[in-house]
Amino acid sequence: MERVAVTEAAVGTRFPLYADPEDGRWTTTGRGSWTGGFWTGLLWLRARYTEDWADRRTAAAWTARLAPWAEADTATRGLIFWYGTAPAGSDGRAAALRERAARACLAAYDPELGLLPWGGALGGPRLLARADGVPGTVPLLAGAGPRGAAAAAAHLHRHLDLCLGEDGRRGDGGRDRERDGGRDRERIGGSDRTRVGGRTGPPPARPHPAWSFDAATGWQPCEDPAPGWSRGRAWLLLAVADALLRPAVSGGAAARLDAAAGQLLAEAGVLGGRAVPPADSSRPDGPLDTSAAAITAVALLKLARVPGPRAAVCAARGEAVLRHLAGAHVTGRGPGRPAGMLLDGCYDAGKGLAVRHELVWGDFFLALGLAALVDGVDLTLV
C-alpha cells in the first residue's frame, strides 16, 4: 500500500492511468475515464488495510468524483462503479452512488439487443458489444432488483454468444428458444432476449472480443481489439465468475455459465500455462500483460468459491499467479523508481501504447487478490 500513497502524492487531483516503467511517472486523466473506479477501489483497499479514518475520508472524496459518470452513456460504468465502490463495504455514500449507477444502467439496457450497449461516452460507435463491457456490469445490474438481475444475465449471455462463438453455447442450462419470424427469442432466468438481425454467416474461426451492430446486417466482428486479446478473455472469465456467485443472475443457466468458464480456462491454458499471458496470444513473443494475469487470478479465486470439482484447482492456481506477479513483476526498493510497481502491463499492444507499464487496474486486481488471500476482503461481495 506504500505505492498507493506515493501515487496519491504524485497525481494530485488527477486520476492515474499508467506509469512509466523507468521512473514511475504517471500518465493521468482529469475525470477518471473508464479506469477511475480502479483508483478509488485501491484507495478503499488501502483504508481497509490501514483502518485509518483519514484514508477512508480520502477514498470517499475520490469516489464522490466518479458521480458524473453515473448517467454517462457507457457500459464501462460496470468497471467504474462496481470496482470503485464495492471495496468501500458499508460506506453509505459509496453504496448510494453504486445504486444510482445501477439504476441508470438498467434504464439504458436495450431489450431488443439484449444488452447494455457499449455507448458513445468514450467516443466511437455506440452499438458495440465488447468483452470489457461485461465485468462489473453483471454485479452492478444485479443490485438493481429482479429486473436488474435479469438484465445482467441477458447482458452476459449476449456477450458470451458473440465473444465465445458457437462453443460458448455449450451447456444451454435451461435456455429455451423459439423462432418468431426472423427473430430468435431466448428466455434466460425468466426474461426475454431478442436477437435482432443475427449473424450473417458462421461465426469466425477465432472468437472476437468486440462486435458492432447494424440493423441491416446484424452483429459483425470488429478487428480491434484483436481476437487474441488476453485481457478480453480475462474480463469475460471475471464476469462469468461473478454471475456464478449470484443465483439471481445464473438462474437456470448455471450449466451454460460453467461450460463458458471451462472454455475460457482451456483456451489460454489458464490452469497450467504461463502465469502471465502475452497481451495478444497470436504474438506469443510480444509484450506480456500482467494486468490480464491479475484479473484472471481474481476470477480464479472467485471460481474457487463456486462449489464444484474445479474449486480447489482454481484456488491453487489463483494464489500461484498472484505470488508470481508479486515476486517477479513488482519493483523492489532501489534508485530511479518507486517500489511496489506492477510492471509489464500492456495498455494497447496493437497501437504500441504503454506496453510494459504499470497499469492502475493491474495494481487494483493484484491488491484485491492479495487482500483476499489474507481474508482482508470477501470476493463474493467485491
Over which residues does each language-model region extend?
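Glycan-recognition and catalytic cores of secretory/periplasmic carbohydrate-active enzymes
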Residues: M1-V382
